[in-house]
UniProtKB/Swiss-Prot annotation:
It is found in: Cytoplasm. GO terms for molecular function: ATP binding; metal ion binding; protein folding chaperone; protein-folding chaperone binding; unfolded protein binding. It comes from Cereibacter sphaeroides (strain ATCC 17025 / ATH 2.4.3). This is Co-chaperonin GroES. CDD domains: cpn10. One of its GO terms (cellular component) is cytoplasm. Heptamer of 7 subunits arranged in a ring. Interacts with the chaperonin GroEL. Its main location: cytoplasm. GO terms for biological process: chaperone cofactor-dependent protein refolding.
Length: 95
């Protein structure tokens, strides 16, 4: 199923966190902290000013981004766990 976010919403896939520590200990799922880093999967076209003028998005599909720990709404699309968030929830783009 294709999904296109509306307005200034962004669809993000979290990056996978490490399964082991540097010392070789396996980290159980209950002890893992969800990463605040992900890859943009899809973007809306942008927000609109009161005048109707479109404000272009700063991120695009494929960008690697950092976002707040509690940002976004978790959704499952085609079996993949993703986040939908506003562009303003994104803290920056990693290069």
């Amino acid at each position: 199923m294709a999904f296109k976010p509306l307005h200034d919403r962004v669809l993000v896939r979290r990056v996978q966190s490490d399964e082991k520590t540097k010392g070789g200990l396996i980290i159980p799922d209950t002890a893992k902290e969800k990463p605040a880093e992900g890859e943009v999967v899809a973007c809306g076209e942008g927000a609109r000013k009161d005048s109707g003028e479109l404000i272009a998005m700063s991120v695009k599909a494929g960008d690697r981004v950092l976002f707040g720990k509690w940002s976004g709404t978790e959704v499952t699309i085609d079996g993949a766990e993703l986040l939908i968030m506003k562009e303003s929830d994104i803290l920056g783009i990693l290069s």
